[in-house]
From Swiss-Prot:
The gene is hpr. The keyword Hydrolase does not apply. Residues 63-86 bind DNA. It comes from the Bacteria. GO terms for molecular function: DNA binding; DNA-binding transcription factor activity. One of its GO terms (biological process) is response to stress. Negative regulator of protease production and sporulation. Residues 13-157 form the HTH marR-type domain. PANTHER family: DNA-BINDING TRANSCRIPTIONAL REPRESSOR SCOC (PTHR33164:SF58), TRANSCRIPTIONAL REGULATOR, MARR FAMILY (PTHR33164). Keywords: DNA-binding, Repressor, Sporulation, Transcription, Transcription regulation. It comes from Shouchella clausii (strain KSM-K16). NCBIfam families: PRK13777.1. Pfam families: MarR (PF01047). This is HTH-type transcriptional regulator Hpr.
Length: 196
């Protein structure tokens, strides 16, 4: 990260940092509670569901990819991925042209469960979504979070934000909605062999 001139009044720095901490904590508490309630019927926790989502989006992610995209420690990504593998939801595989890295992909059961979780999403029980609806009604669109994205870009780097944007775009393109039902459109992008 580039060194910046942080010569700002201490009081301003503390107030900003505290405001960001409290707002982030309040939002996360709501997101976490709603996310847990959403996936509880599928016997998943947040890390497991997030890994399934990343595995779907990246379609052949390494543990490092999952840790990076999921903003989690490598050991957390590995341990929860192994639990999902034991449930038959993920497979560990190698690319034919890259035997060094192990890639994690959704199994058919994993893809099916992931789709079921998407179908079960209920915007009426997701408080952050409900909190943003008045802004959508007023401005015609949901908040785009440009200031927040700028802050995250300075913390995690441009590549993180580019991957984040690409995954959201891919997800929007890969999920089809018809008559209130979701369908995942994409298939594996490269041939895999079981990990040894």
């Amino acid at each position: 990260m580039e060194e910046m001139d942080l010569n700002h009044p201490l009081k301003e720095s503390i107030v900003f940092s505290h405001k960001m901490a409290l707002l982030s904590k309040a939002l996360w508490k709501s997101v976490e509670k709603d996310w847990q309630a959403w996936i509880k019927p599928f016997h998943l926790n947040l890390n497991e569901h997030h890994i399934l989502w990343i595995a779907y989006q990246l379609n052949g992610a390494t543990i490092s990819d999952i840790a990076s995209h999921g903003v989690m420690h490598v050991s957390t990504a590995f341990n929860f991925s192994k639990k999902l593998e034991a449930r038959g939801l993920l497979s560990f595989s190698k690319k034919k042209d890259d035997k060094r890295n192990t890639y994690i992909c959704l199994t058919d059961s994993g893809r099916q469960l992931f789709l079921e979780t998407m179908r079960a999403f209920n915007e009426h029980t997701y408080h952050v979504y409900q909190g943003a609806v008045p802004m959508k009604e007023l401005y015609g669109k949901f908040p785009e979070f440009s200031e927040l994205i700028c802050i995250v870009r300075h913390i995690y780097g441009t590549e993180f934000i580019e991957q984040f944007d690409a995954c959201l775009t891919d997800f929007q393109n890969d999920v089809e909605e018809k008559d209130g039902h979701l369908k995942l459109a994409s298939a594996n992008l490269f041939p895999l062999q079981p990990a040894k």
